[in-house]
């Protein structure tokens, strides 16, 4: 029996995380009593409270709902966490977020988008196309879809679109009908150890595809694949050898217009009102999924044109005739490269000032050479102190290891990020 059947009260440790909050919203819509802990209040936890979910911000076992029968946590929670250990030691059914996603998706038609970058926008765009076209889906997103102001929505149709997270090998708990792989660049080496282990995990992910399922992978990604009992397609921004690719790309009034070439024909004059050439490629993947599902081409075009993006993914904060401020979550060298290329494609003659906060000590150390090369493509770089997230500091690893070797003419490290970042951005946009 699926464990979902008997859940009446559920507790989340780390409820404010983007993936955890989507699950909390799911159970809340199902009439389950939902509560949880997080370290810091945020706009997202504020929204959850407004939706009727009780949240506290102290690691305090007295605030755990003792009626909860399932406790969910993420790998971001440290092993020493008091509440987590209390629940493990006192008979609660303690499971990871990935286990719960497995319960939700195992009996559904599941579309899972994985990749070391690009998956959040691709997942959000795919879910938007299915929703806007009337096809319908339940969506579990790794970001806040701007069109809807949320990372989750439900639908009576037993179709799930889910972002498949490779961190901690969580995506291996899923068994999708349609699997997408956007990128396999080395990342999370604190978990995997080597780039080879990352590729091996993506190969294992393709083994999880249900019989007669579909794999859609970015053209040029190479990793071990078992092609038995599945259709395999490729996609790319403009590689003509890919099953799905773009052609005749133009920039018109700040938007992209292109044709989508696919195995059965061409979808002409697609309009994407979202910056970044990498997002043209993400749109190609999302449209490939929709075409595989048999959604009408005109409905797909309408949906893509109406897609407003994802919060912190090439998000325009200021857009005037002479100043533009873009907020983006890019935290891997390839993501940064895509961001810079996308900005240059829209504003080829403008000065680019890049304010960058490295994410994780381990990633900064492992990817330092890539960060140095890509950051040097900007005209000016302002670095912030490393955001540690789940990690403790690593001796000798700071933003200075990037600063010292960048070849950009103007560069600095902002030693205290509070307030000064906002003031600096406002100064740049005056």
Model segments located where?
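Nucleotide phosphate-binding/pyrophosphate-handling subdomain across enzymes
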Residues: 2-9, 19, 23-30, 252-254, ...
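Phosphate-binding loop of NTP-binding sites
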Residues: 3, 12, 26-32, 49, ...
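Structural motif
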Residues: 9, 69-70, 178, 214, ...
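Glycine-rich Rossmann-fold phosphate-binding loop(s) that bind the pyrophosphate
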Residues: 15-16
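NAD(P)-binding Rossmann-fold cofactor-contacting core
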Residues: 31-47
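Beta-strand->loop->alpha-helix junctions that form or flank phosphate-binding loops
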Residues: 37-38, 56-59, 95-99, 140-143, ...
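Short acidic low-complexity segments
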Residues: 54-66, 417-420
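C-terminal helical cap/extension that packs against the catalytic core
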Residues: 372-423
């Amino acid at each position: 029996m699926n464990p979902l059947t008997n859940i009446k009260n559920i507790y989340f440790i780390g409820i404010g995380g983007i993936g955890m909050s989507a699950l909390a919203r799911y159970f809340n819509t199902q009439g389950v009593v939902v509560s949880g802990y997080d370290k810091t209040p945020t706009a997202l936890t504020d929204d959850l409270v407004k939706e009727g979910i009780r949240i506290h911000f102290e690691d305090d076992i007295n605030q755990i709902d003792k009626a909860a029968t399932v406790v969910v946590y993420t790998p971001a929670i440290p092993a020493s966490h008091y509440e987590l250990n209390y629940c493990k030691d006192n008979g609660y059914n303690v499971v990871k977020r990935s286990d719960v996603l497995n319960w939700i998706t195992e009996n559904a038609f599941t579309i899972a988008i994985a990749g070391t970058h690009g998956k959040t926008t691709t997942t959000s765009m795919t879910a938007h196309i299915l929703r806007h076209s009337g096809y319908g889906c339940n969506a579990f997103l790794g970001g806040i879809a701007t069109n809807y102001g949320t990372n989750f929505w439900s639908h009576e149709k037993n179709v799930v679109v889910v972002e498949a997270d490779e961190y901690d090998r969580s995506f291996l708990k899923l068994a999708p009908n349609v699997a997408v792989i956007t990128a396999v660049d080395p990342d999370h080496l604190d978990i995997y150890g080597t780039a080879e282990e990352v590729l091996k995990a993506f190969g294992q992910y393709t083994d999880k595809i249900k019989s007669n399922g579909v794999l859609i992978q970015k053209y040029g990604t190479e990793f071990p694949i078992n092609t038995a009992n599945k259709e395999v397609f490729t996609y790319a921004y403009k590689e003509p050898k890919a099953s799905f690719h773009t052609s005749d790309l133009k920039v018109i009034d700040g938007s992209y217009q292109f044709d989508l070439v696919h195995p059965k024909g061409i979808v002409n004059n697609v309009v994407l009102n979202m910056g970044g050439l990498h997002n043209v490629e993400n749109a190609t993947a999302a449209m490939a999924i929709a075409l595989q599902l048999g959604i009408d081409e005109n409905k797909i075009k309408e949906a893509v044109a109406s897609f407003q993006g994802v919060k912190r993914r090439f998000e325009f904060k200021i857009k005037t005739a002479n100043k533009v401020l873009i907020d983006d979550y890019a935290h891997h060298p390839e993501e940064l490269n895509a961001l810079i290329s996308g900005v240059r494609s829209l504003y080829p003659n403008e000065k680019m000032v890049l304010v960058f906060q490295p994410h994780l000590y381990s990633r900064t150390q492992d990817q330092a050479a890539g960060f140095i090369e890509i950051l040097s493509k900007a005209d000016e770089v302002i670095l912030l102190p490393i955001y540690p997230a789940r990690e403790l500091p690593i001796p000798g690893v700071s933003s200075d290891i990037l600063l010292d070797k960048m070849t950009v003419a103007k560069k600095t490290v902002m030693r205290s990020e509070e307030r000064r970042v906002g003031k600096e951005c406002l100064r740049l946009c005056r």
